[in-house]
Amino acid sequence: RTKALLVVHLYGKCAFTDELLSICEEHQLLMIEDNAQAHGCLWKGRRTGSVGHAAAHSFYPGKNLGALGDAGGVTTDDEELANIVRALGNYGSSKKYVFDYVGQNSRMDEVQAAVLCEKLKWLDRDNERRVAIATKYVDGIQNTAITLPTKDYLANDVFHIFPVLCAKRDLLQRELHQRSIETIIHYPIPPHKQKCYSEWNALALPITERIHREELSLPLNPTMTDEEVEMVISNVSEIKL
């Protein structure tokens, strides 16, 4: 009964594989991309957000391509779908005072669009800096209590965040906070444990749950200086866990 496959490029990592595309082709499934965290990421010469039937993008200020306020978009080469999406974001209306769908007002204002057009010019440069910082972390952090992304992981990634795993994650976060290094957990509660999915709360997904217990995101953004990067590396390396 499956009609579509939702591919999530989480943390800036491209989620495409040849096998995934073959499955969609074999079973005639639509591929929908969640490209909220992977703006500008390349896979075999193509950008994420341009491979599937449609893709959703977040332009929240913290994203690789971020506006000054809340904003988002959908890309597709399906003209009919594009018209439906435009209508849904315009109260469900494609013609003034005529409503084809139950929609909402989610139009992007001109100021956000102008900011994004300007920042788009610098996206590749900023992503290159993100990858450079991630590479420094992978090469420089020496702490056996922490699992880092592998060298292979660096490919096809624009590092919206830099995730590590640590069995003593909360202790690591406290130690770094005391050293004025702020970190974030992405994400503390897995989807199947959320209140809104109460029918799935009893489901056991041990790998998912371990990741949620152990994940910690180290500081990473293209404005970081080399000195700040080295401070993160040295402090993470010397903390005893």
State where each predicted segment sits.
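Active-site phosphate-binding strand-loop segment of PLP-dependent enzymes
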Residues: 1-67, 73-75, 217
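PLP-dependent aminotransferase class I/II
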Residues: 4-8, 13, 17-19, 42, ...
